[in-house]
């Protein structure tokens, strides 16, 4: 919220924004009083830092620098405080290695920043010590956000972009916690929202009221040796019996090498309001873990055949092998970088590998012909993101081939097995989404396509039979710092050889890292904003909101 917003607090919209900002700011500045510093620092790291700097503090080579084994002198600590408070971008050298990435500012109070940096100082062989809230406050005063309050107030919600002709766009609710998935029975009365830590909330679409349904601490399995808590919970859907399914990914270092465990929880009853309740483990599988690039299960959905389809992503960026270490192991396993099919009606389902070579399937849906269309996020090597027609038994290239490239993405890219044939992505014929005068397969590198929906006959001509794809936006430094941050409309048609090709138009832009879309009610699409930033230099600490795009009433 900015001073400009303060001038309009007399009206209802302004008052609502002020209340939301106030609640967020209050939580930001008082959360540090609830737990002991060691626990709080670890949990803050898991929520805000682990995705890029990894569970072992090693970072990602060339992109996100390590926090383990670096300069933690007084000058180094001051530099770390400054980066957390105001962000950083551009080339830098850490431990003699060059990095060229982006770190957005993290919206935390002085005490919380002190706690998370104290956790870092006392982890992974770092020298130990303690950072105080006073140290943070003194360094922050010299940054472009001189107080925590000024920083929080600067992170207002972006204005809504114009709705396309024939539609309305409205804000349904502002979220108390960042959410990654939506699910519903499709009737348009309510949405269920999944946070990345596993909390589930119910959103009343008529009133915008949000209430907790069940919390991660009450149902997620905990084991000695767990790293993070959990690593990611990113998939949620209903089965045909109305049971809610939630997939969690957890790394555990009790075994050597460390493992990644996927657990799918399933609700077992309804509460007094008729909402799903009491989730319990239904399916579990483990395979060798990795400190970086554990994409694991990121989407699942019931198909037209009644089976549960589960996208289990790659455990590496490009299929590389590690010879030793706590996360040792080969590149991929037979059940990673692929699409599973499970029978939701049996108590101990077996994995059928439905399709292979899929690096990171963040979304898929079926059209009115029963064809599955899937979004796929690409590697750090700047290959285009993909849109694929998924057919049983096919291989979609990973880790041997990205997009429709004929060159290797990396010097270490493994050679494919003899005779293996790849199915290439759908070509984008423009005008948007990465098209730059010649067809591309399929979207801008690092634009991060997320969920996907197919629009049926309850949408107007020009939209009926097309797909909507939100794009989370780039996390890696690129020439275009605003690649993604939008919702695309994708129209597919067959070329002379029978292959699908796409016409892609930008429908909504800019948005605050849109991550999922969901159909609920006739002619209504719900869009989930993960946070509020509309370019990759903006903080993604503050939680986002749910928007409704609806066919306008005639």
Regions found by a protein language model. Name each.
Residues 1-15:
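N-terminal secretory signal peptides that target proteins for export/translocation
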Residues 16-27:
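Bacterial N-terminal signal peptides
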Residues 28-36:
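Bacterial Sec-dependent signal peptides at the C-terminal "C-region" and cleavage site
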Residues 34-35, 94-168, 172:
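Flexible coil segments in periplasmic/lumen-exposed cytochrome c-class electron-transfer proteins
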Residues 35-60, 73-86, 173:
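Sequence/structural segment immediately N-terminal to covalent heme-attachment motifs in c-type
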Residues 58-95, 100-110, 210-218:
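Gly/Gly-Pro-rich "capping" loops immediately C-terminal to redox-active cysteine motifs
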Residues 134, 155-316, 372, 446-496, ...:
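Acidic, Gly/Ser/Thr-rich repeat motifs that build Ca2+-stabilized beta-propeller blades
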Residues 157-163, 231-233, 250-253, 269, ...:
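Beta-propeller domain segments
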